[in-house]
Amino acid sequence: MKKLTLQEKQNSADALLKRINALHKPGETVRLMEVCGTHTVSIFREGLRQLLPSGIELVSGPGCPVCVTDQTYMDKALAYAERDDVIIATFGDMLKVPGSYSSLSEAQTKGAHIHVIYTPLEVVELSKKYPEKKIVFLAIGFETTIAVICATVKAVHAAGLKNVFFLVSHKLVPPALRALLDKQEGHIDGFILPGHVSVIIGEEPYQFLPEEYHIPSCIAGFDGLEILSAIANILEQRKTSNFIVGNTYHSVVMQKGNPVAQAMIKEVYDVCDDAWRGIGVIPNSGLRLKDEYAAYDVERALPIHLERPSLDPKGCQCGRVLQGLIKPSECPLFGKSCTADHPVGACMVSVEGSCAAWYKYGYSSGGSTWEA
């Protein structure tokens, strides 16, 4: 793809904004939900809210895998971390995610064996380095990450490793969108669909949006022009009432996605119901290791019982933020007891979290309040 010059980018942006303004009816409010944490960050970094007509409202959805990881899952991870014979392997952004009573970073200061890894396949090396320990990998993430973790499960199985286990809490994006629409708590006029997830699953899993709910959507890339192009596409659908799954990320996302990755996921996992932080259990929105790989499912191989109930942080509105019902700045804890240095909720922990993005980029020009 040709790299645009700065002037060409400016010209393209001007043309897209002119098109968006022409498609938007003055006085009409249009609420579009971006379903990707990377989109949330890009929208802030590129200053897109300030460029769009005032009636177009961009709200963040459940697009951050760390943020949607359920409280009970974190409590289970912490329970395994307390075992002397266990090493927790995890991505770094999970360290500060609060459980009901602690976090992995706090557990680490108290002696828990926690290793931050950068690729899932590192668990193979950990298992060989510490053969006397049980390596428990915190397997979270959307479809993009799932495909990579599938390869790790198969590698562990092929190597015959007996000391590697997975605490699984993968999430599937399309069922979450259906759940949001079924709840009908917050009005959504269209979805800006995630680029990376769509590389794996393609366009077809989103077809229920236009066919059943008559709502426009568009798969988008991650720079400002690609997001503006998706917004224009959605507004065009609204104007013509010709609702489809748009795709302005054709260079990367194919209609049928990545069949090889899809086949691998089906080989390793079964679909199951799963709990999303602040939202509850969503049917068919999670994955569970197939019986063939049950020996690597830590909850089946090394079952534990949580002695205390899982509790959401008092006052935290993360669940409402994830559903687009409120903006982060409308949470009473935001910027007060909940900050980037001292996060109370998961949405403030991850760099892709809505609250973290609002905290970093959403400061008003006055320097004392956040833009609402």
Model regions: which residues?
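Internal helical hairpin/lid segments
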Residues: S229-R320
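A conserved active-site cap/scaffold subdomain adjacent to cofactor or substrate pockets
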Residues: L167, E185-M254
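Metallocofactor- and cofactor-centric catalytic cores in central/energy metabolism, strongly enriched
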Residues: M1-E132, I146, V156-A158, L167, ...
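Hydrophobic alpha-helical scaffolding
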Residues: L6, C67, L138, F142, ...
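Phosphate/pyrophosphate-binding betaalpha-module
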Residues: L138, F142-P205
